[in-house]
Swiss-Prot record:
The keyword Signal applies. This is Probable beta-glucosidase A. Glycans are attached at residues 65, 214, 255, 318, 325, 357, 493, 526, 545, 567, 664, 715. One of its GO terms (molecular function) is beta-glucosidase activity. Beta-glucosidases are one of a number of cellulolytic enzymes involved in the degradation of cellulosic biomass. Catalyzes the last step releasing glucose from the inhibitory cellobiose. It comes from Emericella nidulans (strain FGSC A4 / ATCC 38163 / CBS 112.46 / NRRL 194 / M139). Belongs to the glycosyl hydrolase 3 family.
Amino acid sequence: MKLGWLEAAALTAASVASAQVKQDDLPVSPPYYPSPWSNGEGEWAEAYNRAVQIVSQMTLDEKVNLTTGTGMSEKCVGQTGSVPRLGINSICLQDGPLGIRFTDYNSAFPAGVNVAATWDRQLAYIRGHAMGQEFSDKGIDVQLGPAAGPLGRFPDGGRNWEGFSPDPVLSGVLFAETIKGIQDAGVIATAKHYLLNEQEHFRQVPEANGYGYNITETLSENVDDKTLHELYLWPFADAVRAGVGAIMCSYQHLNNTQACQNSHLLNKLLKAELGFQGFVMSDWSATHSGVGSALAGMDMTMPGDIAFNDGLSYYGPNLTISVLNGTVPQWRVDDMAVRVMAAFYKVGRDRLATPPNFSSWTRAEKGYEHASIDGGAYGTVNEFVDVQQDHASLIRRVGADSIVLLKNEGSLPLTGKERNVAILGEDAGSNPYGANGCDDRGCAQGTLAMGWGSGTANFPYLVTPEQAIQQEVLKGRGNVFAVTDNWALDKVNKTASESTVSLVFVNAGAGEGFISVDGNEGDRKNLTLWKNGENLIKAAASNCNNTIVVIHSVGAVLVDQFYEHPNVTAILWAGLPGQESGNSLVDVLYGRVNPNGKSPFTWGKTREAYGAPLLTEANNGNGAPQTDHTEGVFIDYRHFDRTNQTPIYEFGHGLSYTTFKYSNLTVQKLNAPAYSPASGQTKAAPTFGTIGEAEDYVFPDSITRVREFIYPWINSTDLKESSGDPNYGWDDEDYIPEGAKDGSPQDVLPSGGGAGGNPRLYDDLFRITAIIKNTGPVAGTEVPQLYVSLGGPNEPKVVLRGFDKLVIQPGEERVFTTTLTRRDLSNWDMEKDDWVITSYPKKVFVGSSSRKLPLRASLPAVQ
């Protein structure tokens, strides 16, 4: 056993040095050191002070315990060590962004992409709060969600559905509201994946090797700082302003440095510029060095071990050694511990925390304390605590409000008096193996209600479209017949020909890269419908002149083969609606809910219409595959506008059972202070308590070592022997980046100075109003959208900058009011390393989508 610990040379000079070696012709990520220390500014003050008080009482091994997962053998997918002397239990971290993974008696909420389709701030908050309640009641301290990485660079990116939208403003608003909801329920939210987790191919070396790709390093996302700030970083700035407690760094490289040891990404952008006060954790097995990651700003390694269940760690005892020998300064490990505890106190977790009442690894009531080794005490591991409350009604509401009515030729809403209703397509029915019959939902059976991977939850039940529609039809004493075999086209033809309305269900899934479904290695291999979907629709439409298509998908699909068919009278996108799938759908089909979803992405005519494909072939030998963001900020609707392409359905599009008229646009300039770059210096890095000597941290004789469990203690007072590192003793100058250990006061970045960046960025410069009138016969909900032209020759034609959701009665007028901040009107200047408002003339547009903008006005110049 001791040999295994000695082999954990995780914080070695060699590992840090090798992380700095890059080929000369590849993009590089500039270094930024030291790692900024938290200061408890703003709403973090009380939590920070409490964290400082408790960390000041900790010994080094106790601080290290807070930074290191104990491996994959405990109840949660991630658990830190504990500090029992001070009454601090291990911190439980659990997936995922749409509900609790690996448990029971929990809810399966609609996916993030569905929340984006609601364009509803309040609903995003309520959903977040409901999820937070469930996590808290299961004894979970940290929810591993929500996600805004991936943002959605590619329409076929595997995990886009976990996030919200490829538009940074829409994503940022809903990201922030979800975080607020989770944390107001007393659980730490995790903003992930930071940053550029835009595709599944090549995100992990073992995973890629398993698919036959010969690589030794993960994908490098090569991107300039303008694109980072104006697109991918934008939602994370909103998350920081929302007070998010944790941020998860991603598997990918940014400009050829691993995200979890990328000082530009973590130290500069996140902590120095955005003023993040919480802690940075690694994605699972995304830690590739110890000293390198610690000095670059990563505060917690998860799940703690290097490879699952190997008992070795880049932190743990190696972090203890590195602090004892001065490789990692005391102030840095103190800051790591303070950040963890500050997040814990900020959400009030100390008042709510209870031990986990479930096991991630078995549904049995009884089991071993340490599941992976069948070791430790044997007893109750699952208490089967029902945490669902009344969340089913909320899930149904989100599902209904997220349905986007793409096309309607008058066939909807249904009356309930249809005599013969055909339900066609496998996507209408049940998975023959059960709703949870495939691990992490990794299959293509039955109706699609979530994607696959770690971002899933177990269904407590799943109401299928077939079940819900049949109930509706029978209420009206009609006939209903279902064919749920997509390949039985002869049966489809016959059933459709005998129906007064044919409801055709099709889908397309995607998910995390560790699962491949029908050759889709996480990412989709194309944008077509699955399982003969196009032919299914055409067969039905050829035999029924009232064919309604319902699409359950992770994002855009190609509809070019059927959207103009004269017998396809309506098309609805229902996304990934969660457990109430069928019920939320019938609410819209039968008019109980007037459809009010708006598409959070663009529907192109071909895959090529979206621009470059995601990378599926290694292009750098066996080194890190390289993907260059040559498109800059031009993704989704920005790309379509730039290339003068007309999409089938544009970003923001969504029909209603009523109509709306826009008028009376007004622009009011507000009094706001002039922009001034932040200046001054931070205080010196504080230290809390003392470190002691090596003999204080030798593995205690009183502790029985558990195989695979990660401890903070060392094996010997001889630090070189304890490290097992053949390169132990290198001089700092040989491998420690310049300034990385400097705890003296540091200059404040011009773009920094507050949560989310320079506080002046968030000053309101203009108030925009418009009148929206319901000109139809029924009450409806409209989403007015504000777009801005920033005016520059190399800028997008328009960018979304505001929206609202208004319930409007027939004949009623409502006023849409929003503001434009300095950030909304700024561009990132890479020379000044700051935001600037250019001198180009700027315009505002208001309408119902990115292509339907009837109102426009020029903005007065602003400094």
